[in-house]
């Protein structure tokens, strides 16, 4: 390790010894000129010097930055004799910027030290005052004790000696007067002392307050200076492009030296350029003074125009740095609005979306998810706005703070089509609802409640056809117990498996009713084995599911099924709030021609009364009338009771929640908000076009479309039929539901069908008189159905008629060339023997040589014994002339075929 003296170090670095000693002292090292300096001390000195000069290249954090600036300009002065000359003027400026944190730390440290010193002085003064008070109190006690002792001794002497009483009394009075004067003097001294202490304390507090204010003022000045410096640094950083004539010197910084060299080089290049003319100098002088500048055109040019003086031109440039901010995004947003929130141009947003694979325009509505991805891609923080505050406020304003009471179970009857679900329910209700359903199959959700000896049960009867998947799912979601009806002769079928999946997804217990046990081919054990494959295990096998063998036709074990249902409900301990505002679910809805929108609502909690204001999805209204499943008028309905309500503004969607609210105006606002949000979200999803789908969309132009206007009696049927028809679409024919709704067929539907070249399908509905006239006038295809099987089959037939036909080539004859003749009219004539089938005139043919097709064309001439014939059968000779072909050789085969059109169907 090499060590030098301070003097040697000063000679080595070229610094005076006194200056070096001062720098060492500032760095915390007191040295003399003859002391040794180690490498660690050198490093410490270097770090201190870097810190003093604001160098950030080392480990020390810079605290100061010194900038030098030179500005050159040209001034035109009068040189006498009417001449002027240009004088170069150079202005040099030097500024030192101190880092904000260092100033704040120093001010804070000074304030802390001052506060500590004041606290120590205050503690010291308090200790001195306490000691002084103790000394004074001790002196006072000693004086009192001494006076007391003297008085006692005097009294004792008076009693003992019995001397002259007058002299003693006089002495006593003198002593008392002296003691009194001493006490008064002490009181005066104590008051003076306290007054002096109070004055001193006030002076100290005033000094302390002034010191704190001075410290705070210095701190604020330092903070303001730091903020100003920060703004200047930011401005200098942003305006780097305007610094060609500016020279910055940052000491001990490599990057600063490089910038300095670059600036000098540019300055030298500028100096070599041609000097400005006198007119340009005057123009620049006018610009500096804010005077007008006139640009005059040449000969024949336009007149000059006054340009704005420099003082009137704005000096603000658009920031090149994109401001990162929080972007609030709602359910949907327009592309231009999203760009405004991010403070960028809409074209930038569209570019980002195109890179992400989404095509959009400036006025297009995009959904929340897409907008969030775009904003995060551009570096912004996204805040998703909750727009349903009014909805939550309306739904939370309810008076359901009542005690829950036991309620009846809601049981859903599910199973495969024609397994006896409705028949089982019929026997329970002692009615014949199945005969009222077209084709004997259930096509709606029937909601009924029945009274048994052990209690009330509410039943939901769901369709078993494959088209009614959504209706079965809704039935499972709104239920407490699922009764799975399985025919003992058929076993497990596709809709049986689907019902099991719905029940498991809803998390409700499953009771299996094995029906049709009265049939000879019934096999209940086989049903158990098949259901065990889907984790439906009977209790006797150690499972959790109860099995009941019933016969809906004869009523066997129906009572046992009801007891099993009530037993399962008792285990579940089903409760609900009976009083208060009602809430439930829309099981089914339809548009009645005489009564308007009708919704079947299953009340789940509270009591629904006539006159209540009900909010159902996008619809609302006051309950004008309520009917039970039989059709009787009722005034109220409690939990687990299904009722039909009238008075809604429109037909609600099946599965919507029905809630009683207080204010009709707020209910209307919530319904309108839901409808608007539904439209916006639907539009945003429809307009979402991906780049990867562009070519498939182009190819879709060749696809035939079957447009359909669908009307049905209830909402569930519309949903089921539309879903089934949409699934019929193939690559060649697409089913397009241009319009659907609940209720009869109106003239509006006919106009829509005419405009879109569609057919009208009515399911359990009819067209009114005006609609029939419009349909006949436009020759629109109108069809009525009451069974969903027939509707789907006929739509398949219509789609089959739109398929492009297939063509098949069938070989009808084969002839062998035995000889070739020349004809002046027809050219080469092949003398042939028909070996297979028959040969027809004007039929397409192929010429085969060594079983290889060498020509395909048309048979032009067919003769037998110089007579033209239409056809020649197998085993006969004939002459064949091939159209536009003369290279027929002996041994060739002529194959005759015909093209057959094959009719295609939709499977």
Swiss-Prot record:
It comes from the Bacteria. Residues 515-518 are annotated as: G4. Residues 551-553 are annotated as: G5. Its main location: cytoplasm. Residues 28-44, 101-248 have a biased composition (Basic and acidic residues). GTP binds at residues 415-422, 461-465, 515-518. Belongs to the TRAFAC class translation factor GTPase superfamily. Classic translation factor GTPase family. IF-2 subfamily. One of the essential components for the initiation of protein synthesis. Protects formylmethionyl-tRNA from spontaneous hydrolysis and promotes its binding to the 30S ribosomal subunits. Also involved in the hydrolysis of GTP during the formation of the 70S ribosomal complex. This is Translation initiation factor IF-2. It comes from Vibrio vulnificus (strain CMCP6). The lineage of its organism: Bacteria, Pseudomonadati, Pseudomonadota, Gammaproteobacteria, Vibrionales. The gene is infB.
